[in-house]
C-alpha cells in the first residue's frame, strides 16, 4: 500500500479506503475498535473520528450510535463523489471508468439538452454562447465543455441533472484536459456547440437526440485512440 497523503487526516482516510478496496476491511465486516484503529494508523482518536464521519457521509462506512462501525459495499452506498478515488485505486480500470462516465453523460444529456431548448431557449443560448470566446488550448476547452453541459443541465429546469454533472466534475475535467490537447477534439467540440446553438435557435428539438448521440460516438472514437497515452494525473493523488 503506497499512501501519498500529507496530513494525518488525509493519511488515515487513504489508509481506510485502500484497506476497504483491498479487502483488508471487506464490505459487510466491522472496523476495528477506535482505539485499536487509531494506533494501527498512527493518528489521534479525534482525527480518526473526523475521518470516519467523512467516510460515512461518502458511503464507505455506516456509523450507528452505540454499535460498531460497519464497512459498506460502496458500489451500493456511495455516490459520484467517489469517482476520482476509484480512479486512483485502480489505474487499470480508469479507461473503462471514463468510458462509463462519458456514456452516462451522453445518455442523460440527450434528455436535458432537449428539455432546456424547449423550456428555456434563451438561457440555453446564453450557455452555448461561451463557445464563441474560448481560447484554443486544452485547459480552456476542458472548462468550457464542463460548463456547457452543466449549464444546459440546469437550464432544463430540473436541478437533479445539474447535480449529476456536478458529481462528475473532478474526473470529467481531468479527462477533458487530456482529451482536448488534441486539436481534432477541440474542432469537433466547437462544431458540436455551434450545431446545438443552431438547433436551439431554430427550435429543432427533435434533432437534439441524434446530434448528441453522433457527437458522443465521434468524440468516443477520438478518445479511444488517445487512451493508450493516458497521463498518470487522471487519478487523484493523496491529500
UniProtKB/Swiss-Prot annotation:
Gene3D superfamilies: GntR ligand-binding domain-like, Winged helix-like DNA-binding domain superfamily/Winged helix DNA-binding domain. One of its GO terms (cellular component) is cytoplasm. Its main location: cytoplasm. GO terms for biological process: fatty acid metabolic process; regulation of fatty acid metabolic process. InterPro entries: FA-response_TF_FadR (IPR014178), FadR_C (IPR028374), TF_FadR/GntR_C (IPR008920), Tscrpt_reg_HTH_GntR (IPR000524), WH-like_DNA-bd_sf (IPR036388), WH_DNA-bd_sf (IPR036390). It is found in: Cytoplasm. The keyword Magnesium does not apply. Residues 34-53 bind DNA. It holds the Pfam family GntR. Keywords: Activator, Cytoplasm, DNA-binding, Fatty acid metabolism, Lipid metabolism, Repressor, Transcription, Transcription regulation. GO terms for molecular function: DNA binding; DNA-binding transcription factor activity; fatty-acyl-CoA binding. Residues 6-74 form the HTH gntR-type domain. Homodimer. Multifunctional regulator of fatty acid metabolism. PANTHER family: FATTY ACID METABOLISM REGULATOR PROTEIN (PTHR43537:SF52), TRANSCRIPTIONAL REGULATOR, GNTR FAMILY (PTHR43537). This is Fatty acid metabolism regulator protein. It comes from Escherichia fergusonii (strain ATCC 35469 / DSM 13698 / CCUG 18766 / IAM 14443 / JCM 21226 / LMG 7866 / NBRC 102419 / NCTC 12128 / CDC 0568-73).
Amino acid at each position: 500500500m503506497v499512501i501519498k497523503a500529507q496530513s494525518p487526516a488525509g493519511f488515515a482516510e487513504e489508509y481506510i479506503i485502500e484497506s476497504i478496496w483491498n479487502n483488508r476491511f471487506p464490505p459487510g465486516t466491522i472496523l476495528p475498535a477506535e482505539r485499536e484503529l487509531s494506533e494501527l494508523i498512527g493518528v489521534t482518536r479525534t482525527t480518526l473520528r473526523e475521518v470516519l464521519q467523512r467516510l460515512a457521509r461518502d458511503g464507505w462506512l455506516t456509523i450507528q450510535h452505540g454499535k460498531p462501525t460497519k464497512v459498506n459495499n460502496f458500489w451500493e452506498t456511495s455516490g459520484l463523489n467517489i469517482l476520482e478515488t476509484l480512479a486512483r485505486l485502480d489505474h487499470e480500470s480508469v479507461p473503462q471508468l471514463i468510458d462509463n462516465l462519458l456514456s452516462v453523460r451522453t445518455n442523460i444529456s440527450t434528455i436535458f439538452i432537449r428539455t432546456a431548448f424547449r423550456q428555456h431557449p434563451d438561457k440555453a443560448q446564453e450557455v452555448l454562447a461561451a463557445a464563441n470566446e474560448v481560447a484554443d488550448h486544452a485547459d480552456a476547452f476542458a472548462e468550457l465543455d464542463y460548463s456547457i453541459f452543466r449549464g444546459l443541465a440546469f437550464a432544463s429546469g430540473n436541478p437533479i441533472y445539474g447535480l449529476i454533472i456536478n458529481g462528475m466534475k473532478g474526473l470529467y475535467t481531468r479527462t477533458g484536459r487530456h482529451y482536448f490537447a488534441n486539436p481534432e477534439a477541440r474542432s469537433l467540440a466547437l462544431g458540436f456547440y455551434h450545431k446545438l446553438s443552431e438547433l436551439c435557435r431554430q427550435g429543432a428539438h427533435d434533432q437534439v437526440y441524434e446530434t448528441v448521440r453522433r457527437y458522443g460516438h465521434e468524440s468516443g472514437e477520438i478518445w479511444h485512440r488517445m487512451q493508450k497515452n493516458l497521463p498518470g494525473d487522471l487519478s487523484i493523488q493523496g491529500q
